[in-house]
UniProtKB/Swiss-Prot annotation:
Species classification: Bacteria, Pseudomonadati, Pseudomonadota, Gammaproteobacteria, Enterobacterales
Job description of the protein: Catalyzes the reversible phosphorylation of UMP to UDP.
Major subcellular site: cytoplasm
Activity regulation statement: Allosterically activated by GTP. Inhibited by UTP.
Gene: pyrH
Position of the signal peptide: none
Binding-site list for ATP: K15, L16, S17, G18, G58, R62, T165, F171, D174
Protein name stated in the entry: Uridylate kinase
Catalytic activity, as annotated: UMP + ATP = UDP + ADP
Length: 241
């Protein structure tokens, strides 16, 4: 039951984890999951919401894992950035097949594959109701795609970062290990730090906090959850000042 007739956001940054794209496969990209996500993004565009997207790469590659095995962390992170580009290409294709205009921008130059990231161009595209997918993280090693999501969210002046996860929001403890854990409806940045809740890495989180960028954590696997978030319904956990 919608509480608002109109969306509460005009421009958002949607953060999708790479794992979200793998579905039940455990690796790679599940085409049915990809198409469902494209349809959910299409709904937002049809509501008049301007959508930026940052996708992780964990379904294809994780730099930190190989760094522990001895690989140079910078090399591993560069490989991780390329994984996000592969996911971005898949998402752009899924959006195009759903008749949604989308542009893929990479923080590292990949001529002939996708556009280079340009802040001015991204803003112009968003204003023209194009979905803009930001790939390759921040373009720098040692920074997560959550950091990229907050950075791009601030740059494009998004009203919130919507972090799509596999759980219903932020809990007082791991809901898998502790079934009686409490789901938080709303938290302040300070609450998250004091309770040491795992929302995103500290660099990403403090960036959002310092720029008063609200973060909404919700379950992307719940049908219609994304729409409910943008319509202002009770869904997931909101973090603000």
């Amino acid at each position: 039951m919608a509480t608002n007739a109109k969306p509460i956001y005009q421009r958002i940054l949607l953060k999708l984890s790479g794992e979200a794209l793998q579905g039940a496969e455990g690796f790679g990209i599940d085409a049915s999951v990809l198409d469902r996500m494209a349809q959910e993004v299409k709904e937002l565009v049809e509501l008049g919401i301007q959508v930026g997207v940052v996708i992780g790469g964990g379904n294809l590659f994780r730099g930190t894992g190989l760094a522990k095995a001895g690989m140079n962390r910078v090399v591993g992170d560069h490989m991780g950035m390329l994984a996000t580009v592969m996911n971005g290409l898949a998402m752009r294709d899924a959006l195009h097949r759903a008749y949604v205009n989308a542009r893929l921008m990479s923080a590292i130059p990949l001529n002939g594959v996708c556009d280079n990231y340009s802040w001015a161009e991204a803003i112009s595209l968003l204003r023209n109701n194009r979905v803009v997918i930001f790939a390759a993280g921040t373009g720098n090693p040692f920074f997560t795609t959550d950091s990229a999501a907050c950075l791009r969210g601030i740059e494009i002046e998004a009203e919130a970062v919507l972090k799509a996860t596999k759980v219903d929001g932020i809990f007082s403890a791991d809901p898998v290990k502790h079934p009686d854990a409490t789901l938080y409806d709303q938290l302040s940045y300070q609450d998250v730090l004091e309770k040491e809740l795992k929302v995103m890495d500290l660099a990403a989180f403090t960036l959002a906090r310092d720029h008063n960028l609200p973060i909404r954590v919700f379950n992307m696997n719940k049908p219609g959850a994304l729409r409910r978030v943008v319509m202002g319904d009770k869904e997931g956990t909101l973090i603000t000042k």
